[in-house]
């Protein structure tokens, strides 16, 4: 447990380092903290903070910098919340409101990623709204012996095709009968609802219809998952100009791999979508994106009161967390508003 003197010095050190990007020495702390302490006393407190793992001393400087643990304590206990005033506290957000108007979902999330990147000067990320896979219309077409083309049409007109191999050959008439039966009894239901009904109804279905139905459900589920694994990334090139990364090609390479492959990023944003409000990961806290020099500020967004995706900012641990929280929070609200309007 830190006393008030240590808290003040840690808060001052973090704020100065975020602002200047340079290790903070005892003389700077003495001036900036407003505490009337001798240099020796400040050095003793700094030594205690370093022993607690809250600050560290770079080899090239006598000053100190915050560690991920120090940033976490700062964010959790010392951060002063800024007012959510788009016009006065963050003028760029007023312009963002003009960009994030009701539109096609893909355009909204693309604009949102750009807004996050432009305002933060870091990387903006937005996951596409999750869609519940729904059976609308299905057709089976014979391609050859034991080969069937499955054509799945979504409620919004998207068409997905897949070739499946069946246990026996089916005539065109059988395939038409199967598709007519499925469309008549299951159209309009979610993939999950169809899956649950099949558990109880499969014994009553004719063998060929049951097998084709199972293949259709599997295909529909995979198609829906594929649509939901979309993330828009904007501003990756901003990392090239940050002193925190620009001189470390190894870290840059790992970061660009993260943005290109997107699998880890999707997992992290999926976890974030289960939290209410803004969530902050500092350094390797998430264990999904284990970069000690990286922080993620994220928040879920909704459509008609239901969480359907996540957005956020990715940048160095040396970021102005109060400002990033505000940018992410308001952008989340604007996206929610844009997607919820009919």
UniProtKB/Swiss-Prot annotation:
Disulfide bonds: none annotated. GO terms for molecular function: DNA binding. It holds the Pfam family HrcA. One of its GO terms (biological process) is negative regulation of DNA-templated transcription. The keyword Transcription applies. The keyword Repressor applies. Keywords: Repressor, Stress response, Transcription, Transcription regulation. InterPro entries: GAF-like_dom_sf, HrcA, HrcA_C, WH-like_DNA-bd_sf, WH_DNA-bd_sf, WHTH_HrcA_DNA-bd, WHTH_transcript_rep_HrcA_IDD. Negative regulator of class I heat shock genes (grpE-dnaK-dnaJ and groELS operons). Prevents heat-shock induction of these operons. Belongs to the HrcA family. This is Heat-inducible transcription repressor HrcA.
């Amino acid at each position: 447990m830190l006393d008030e003197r240590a808290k003040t010095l840690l808060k001052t050190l973090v704020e100065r380092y975020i602002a200047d990007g340079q290790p903070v020495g005892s003389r700077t702390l003495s001036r900036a903290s407003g505490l009337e302490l001798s240099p020796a006393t400040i050095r003793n407190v700094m030594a205690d903070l370093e022993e607690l793992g809250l600050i560290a001393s770079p080899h090239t400087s006598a000053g100190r910098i915050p560690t991920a643990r120090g940033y976490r304590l700062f964010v959790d206990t010392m951060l002063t919340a800024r007012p959510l005033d788009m016009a006065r506290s963050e003028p760029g957000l007023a312009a963002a409101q003009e960009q994030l108007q009701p539109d096609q979902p893909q355009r909204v999330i693309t604009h949102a990623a750009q807004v996050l990147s432009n305002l933060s000067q870091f990387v903006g990320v937005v996951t596409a709204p999750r869609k519940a896979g729904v059976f609308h219309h299905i057709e089976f077409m014979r391609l050859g012996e034991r080969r069937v083309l499955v054509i799945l049409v979504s409620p919004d007109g998207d068409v997905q095709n897949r070739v499946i191999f069946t246990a026996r050959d089916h005539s065109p008439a059988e395939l038409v009968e199967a598709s007519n039966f499925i469309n008549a009894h299951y159209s309009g239901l979610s993939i999950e609802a169809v899956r649950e009904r099949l558990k109880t109804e499969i014994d009553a279905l004719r063998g060929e219809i049951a097998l084709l139905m199972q293949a259709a459900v599997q295909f529909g589920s995979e198609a829906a998952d594929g649509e939901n694994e979309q993330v828009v990334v904007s501003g990756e090139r901003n990392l090239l100009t940050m002193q925190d990364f620009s001189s470390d090609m190894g870290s840059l390479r790992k970061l660009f791999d993260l943005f290109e492959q997107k699998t880890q990023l999707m997992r992290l944003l999926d976890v974030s979508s289960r939290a209410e409000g803004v969530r902050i990961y500092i350094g390797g806290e998430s264990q999904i994106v284990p970069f000690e020099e990286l922080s993620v500020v994220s928040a879920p967004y909704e459509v008609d009161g239901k969480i359907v995706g996540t957005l956020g900012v990715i940048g160095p641990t040396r970021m102005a967390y109060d400002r990033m929280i505000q940018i992410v929070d308001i952008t989340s609200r604007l996206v929610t508003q844009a997607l919820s309007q009919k």
